[in-house]
């Protein structure tokens, strides 16, 4: 059975996560405030960041950078800047 939450990112009611996807207090916040749709948008950005910046998830500094980008994107409304990438609608 799906749960409905008010998604902080989308600013509307949406389907919530089925379980906590990220550890710790930040994970609890994501579970309670971020919808499946918003999380999918983040995953797309995250993949681009990892690939373009050649991040290694075994490197603690790279994980910290990615986590900060996630917080900025999901909770602070900041767009993820990926060098050399131009969104389709801005071409």
Swiss-Prot record:
GO cellular component: cytosol
GO terms of molecular function: iron ion binding
Keyword Chloroplast: no
Domain of life of the organism encoding this protein: Bacteria
InterPro entries the record matches: Fe_traffick_prot_YggX, Fe_traffick_prot_YggX_sf
Iron recorded as keyword: yes
Record's subunit section: Monomer.
General function of this protein: Could be a mediator in iron transactions between iron acquisition and iron-requiring processes, such as synthesis and/or repair of Fe-S clusters in biosynthetic enzymes.
Name of the protein this chain belongs to: Probable Fe(2+)-trafficking protein
